[in-house]
């Protein structure tokens, strides 16, 4: 099956609208959002940042992508991987420019793959040897001992997106449909005219940081933004709004640490999250996973639930979890701390309980399980359990339990077409629906 590019997608959609609209080229418009998330940077290789999970695929592309049948096809690569006597060979498309004007070569691919192998990409690249640039061809690289088929599938994962050498999350760059500019509490995406797979249809996407969920919903109700994050207004629904029902982009997870002592043993976290009532988490856009089984309440004595103080959504959710996890004499208390302190506590496992996020890169059960395993220990992702029926099967022996999956949801202004797919480069403004 031949995949649809962004321009072909538009042509297909345009065929369904009025004849008067067929001649219009909808390359205009600004989409506004307010989100209660941490605005510390955009990193395509991050597996623990919701903002990056939502918007990094709009600024950076992987070497391959998957068609509607789940088969890899070339995106930034000129062809599918070639089998060689020592492994697999990949050649980059020529003349690829990043949004900030950097010409890409195989050296940038090697940099990107090594970078993500030490970060979020460890989940899918842990089984592969480090890539090697071809000294005679600036566009080619090899991956020793790699199967071309397995390599192409792994390198279609958004966590393996290609970025220029010297990449920084605070000045993000890539070949995607948008160019990103980060502010202290804002993110602006503008059309990238040199995008490798076609520039965005919208002129720009403007994001600002909400102080909490209520702030995000109020902004939609009063017309300040075009997306109601996780709902349609704070006090009353917006009459003209349409439902927004997009893809899963990750899981909220609960970690048990060394300070939990016996309650920090593998499998306890999964039991704690299994007992959480889904109805109490609905307003957070969280859907518990089916088949979690019977749960337990916290029994390890009074403890803190650590959370990044710069992530309003996570802080609000943690406070809602307090009463759901606590039992008499075993009170759980939300403790917001600076992100650097939170990261160090997570690394050393010096906590009783800790609230975290793990990015879901696609719907493949094995790769999803690898992401969760890697969040505990990247070495575990190299040997995921076989015959998985659910990602829950991968967490029953971990120090991490799934609170629930989080998806793009809420409400949207009707003039923005294609938002439900969350392929932001393909979203376009339909003036007839204003």
Residue locations for each model-derived region?
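N-terminal lobe/hinge region of extracytoplasmic solute-binding protein
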Residues: 34-85, 91, 114, 173-174
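A structural "hinge/loop" feature
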Residues: 37-54, 76-77, 102, 149-160, ...
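Aromatic- and charge-enriched surface segment that lines or borders ligand/interaction sites
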Residues: 55, 79-121, 140, 262-264
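Surface-exposed binding/hinge segments that line
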Residues: 82-85, 121-166
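Alpha-helical secondary-structure segments
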Residues: 105-112, 140, 204, 222, ...
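Gly/Pro-rich hinge or "lid" segments in bacterial periplasmic/extracellular proteins
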Residues: 147, 152-206, 211-215
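Extracellular/periplasmic solute-recognition and catalytic clefts
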Residues: 181-190, 206-259
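Detector for C-terminal structural segments
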Residues: 184, 273-296, 312-322, 346-434
């Amino acid at each position: 099956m031949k995949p649809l590019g962004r321009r072909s997608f538009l042509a297909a959609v345009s065929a369904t609208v009025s004849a008067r609209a067929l001649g219009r080229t909808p390359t205009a418009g600004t989409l506004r959002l307010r989100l209660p998330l941490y605005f510390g940077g955009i990193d395509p290789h991050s597996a623990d940042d919701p903002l990056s999970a939502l918007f990094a695929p709009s600024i950076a592309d992987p070497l391959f992508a998957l068609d509607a049948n789940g088969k890899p096809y070339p995106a930034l690569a000129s062809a599918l991987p070639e089998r060689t006597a020592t492994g697999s060979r990949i050649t980059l498309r020529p003349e690829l420019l990043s949004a900030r004007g950097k010409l890409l070569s195989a050296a940038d691919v090697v940099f990107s793959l090594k970078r993500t192998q030490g970060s979020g990409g460890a989940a899918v690249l842990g089984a592969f040897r480090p890539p090697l640039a071809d000294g005679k061809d600036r566009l080619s690289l090899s991956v020793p001992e790699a199967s071309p088929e397995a390599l192409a599938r792994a390198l279609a994962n958004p966590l393996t997106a290609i970025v220029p050498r010297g990449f920084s999350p605070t000045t993000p760059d890539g070949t995607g449909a948008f160019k990103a500019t980060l502010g202290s509490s804002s993110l602006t995406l503008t059309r990238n005219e040199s995008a490798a797979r076609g520039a965005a249809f919208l002129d720009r996407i403007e994001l600002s940081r909400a102080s909490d969920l209520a702030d995000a919903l109020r902004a939609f109700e009063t017309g300040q933004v075009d997306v109601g994050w996780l709902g349609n207004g704070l006090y009353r629904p917006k009459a003209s709004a349409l439902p927004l029902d997009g893809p899963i982009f990750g899981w909220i997870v609960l970690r048990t640490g060394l300070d939990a002592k016996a309650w920090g043993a593998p499998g306890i976290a999964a039991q704690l999250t299994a007992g959480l009532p889904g109805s109490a988490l609905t307003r957070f856009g969280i859907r518990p996973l089916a088949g979690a089984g019977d749960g337990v309440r916290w029994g390890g004595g009074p403890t803190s639930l650590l959370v990044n103080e710069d992530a309003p959504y996570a802080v609000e959710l943690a406070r809602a979890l307090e009463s759901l996890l606590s039992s008499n004499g075993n009170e759980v208390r939300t403790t917001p701390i600076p992100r650097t302190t939170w990261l160090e506590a997570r690394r050393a496992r010096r906590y009783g309980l800790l609230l975290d996020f793990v990015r879901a890169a696609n719907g493949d059960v094995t790769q999803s399980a690898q992401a969760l395993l890697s969040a505990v220990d990247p070495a575990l992702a190299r040997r995921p359990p076989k015959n998985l029926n659910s990602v829950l099967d991968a967490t029953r022996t971990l120090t991490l339990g799934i609170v629930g999956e989080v998806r793009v949801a809420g409400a949207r202004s009707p003039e923005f077409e294609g938002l439900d797919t969350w392929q932001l480069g393909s979203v376009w403004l339909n003036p007839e629906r204003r």
